[in-house]
Amino acid sequence: MTELAELAELEIAGFADGHPIANLLLIRRLLEYLRPLNRPIALWPCDPQLVGNGVMREGHDSIVFGLPGIPAIAETTAIAALLECVEEVGTPVHLMRLSTARGVELVRLAKQRGLPITASTTWMHLLLNTASIGSYDPSLRLNPPLGRYADQQALLQAVKDGVVDAIAIDHSPYTYEEKTVAFAEAPPGAIGLQLALPLLWQILVASGQWSALELWAALSTRPALCLSQTPASITPGQAAEMVLFNPHQSWIADSQTLKSRSMNTPWLGQAITGQVIKLWSPIASQETG
């Protein structure tokens, strides 16, 4: 366990662990130590023992594709245990990387009971499901794995309703050599910083399923609130923090247009409508188009 109090004194935004913590005693101790520090903690609910050697969500598609499956209870049992810890200790927790319909339901019920939790899912879990894995594209091997269609629809509705507070990018770059292997041997993850907003807009907003404000709340306003931060605003005389986005700009996702040194995305080589043109932040502004 790191020096939580000393880090809190340095005014860090919060704490997180990119890997699941299977030790419930450690989780309980973390929550107890964090309670007086007034800093959020983000945890990924996942039981590594139930994950085993799985590489995609267990179910019909995993059988058809001949790939070892990961049961949904690898997530939901971990959520249930974590919620019990939160209820006992009272420390606010952000649940990262939700990927199952049952996980959404557990979060919904916990919020109705008044537990101090927030939650997020990733943008790729909103746009894709296990049916996409039939291509065996290694960029579709994610952690947690893509859910079934019912999981995808539950996540979409939960984000729109605010049960799932935020959309995470979970940008995970890998080299060409690391991802140019068989699906089951590839490390899990895909890039997304440059792709998430255009594709979410193209598939959800341009189609009329979501409003622009609903998408922006899930990508910007509510994530800030999950971290106990003040959402960005436009105030005369203050440093700008804005994104200039052209929803009609068409481009091809390739080595010339992607700013990342990694190309591990299932949208590589595809035409995308919508592009971030420029960023403004208190640190610097940057042209991206």
PLM segments and residue spans:
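Flexible loop residues that form catalytic
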Residues: 20, 98, 172, 248, ...
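C-terminal cap of metal-dependent C-N hydrolases
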Residues: 182-185, 239-289
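Residue-level signal for pocket-adjacent positions within structured domains
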Residues: 62-65, 121, 137, 141, ...
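Short, positively charged
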Residues: 145, 211-212, 255-260
